[in-house]
């Protein structure tokens, strides 16, 4: 499960992380600010260190990370129907 939260404390995101961990699912968090609970609860956390409330840079970097991950999957898991 990949979860994204700038504050790292979004209740729905933390609930999803805890649910996934209870089911034995590996979790990856993308957090910003101070990382919040997401940084502590995720199996792997990618933290974008920004000042609290600095959503713009946090969301921009999260978008770049998601784009890179998408490019990786497209390059490594090509489907003949594409």
List where the protein language model places each region.
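Glycine-rich phosphate-binding loops that contact phosphosugars or nucleotide phosphates
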Residues: 1-81
